[in-house]
């Protein structure tokens, strides 16, 4: 049990980060009309958009994915990518999703992440899943 579900825009920054993690992962399609449904608990990784407020911070594709009740019931945590140029709002998508889905905001990283970010997320994800009840 260590699935990562992620969205990456055409910039591919989040995609490259997830690839470097080397964990089982499924990508939310760029096309909002393409439906993805997962059948096991997962941690969501998303980029943050916008320059400050909560409106527009979460990618539309991630919103559509989470609007599926089945998908929303299986989210266990969120990790956000962002840009420090946004100041206090960097990684805001993680805050929004964590609050709306009542899950922990586990980590945030900038753009494609650093080697330290990769190590921190790998370790954190492993520890997170070890703490989860096995019958979930």
From Swiss-Prot:
One GO process term, biological-process aspect: protein modification process
GO molecular function terms attached to this record: FMN binding
Record Pfam families: Flavodoxin_NdrI (PF07972)
Gene3D superfamilies reported in the protein's UniProt record: 3.40.50.360
InterPro entries linked: Flavoprotein-like_sf (IPR029039), RNR_Ib_NrdI_bac (IPR020852), RNR_NrdI (IPR004465)
Domain of life: Bacteria
Family: Belongs to the NrdI family.
Task of the protein: Probably involved in ribonucleotide reductase function.
NCBIfam families on file: nrdI
Protein name: Protein NrdI
Organism annotation: Klebsiella pneumoniae (strain 342)
Encoding gene per record: nrdI
């Amino acid at each position: 049990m260590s699935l990562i579900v992620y969205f990456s825009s055409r910039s591919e920054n989040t995609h490259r980060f997830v690839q470097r993690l080397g964990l089982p992962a499924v990508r939310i399609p760029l096309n909002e009309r393409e439906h993805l449904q997962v059948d096991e608990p997962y941690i969501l990784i998303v980029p943050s958009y916008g320059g400050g407020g909560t409106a527009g911070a979460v990618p539309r594709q991630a919103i559509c994915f989470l609007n599926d009740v089945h998908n929303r019931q299986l989210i266990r945590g969120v990790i956000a990518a962002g840009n420090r140029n946004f100041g206090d709002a960097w990684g805001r998508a993680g805050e929004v999703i964590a609050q709306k889905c009542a899950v922990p905001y586990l980590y945030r990283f900038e753009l494609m992440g650093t080697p330290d970010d990769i190590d921190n997320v790998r370790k954190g994800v492993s520890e997170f899943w070890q703490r989860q009840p096995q019958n979930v």
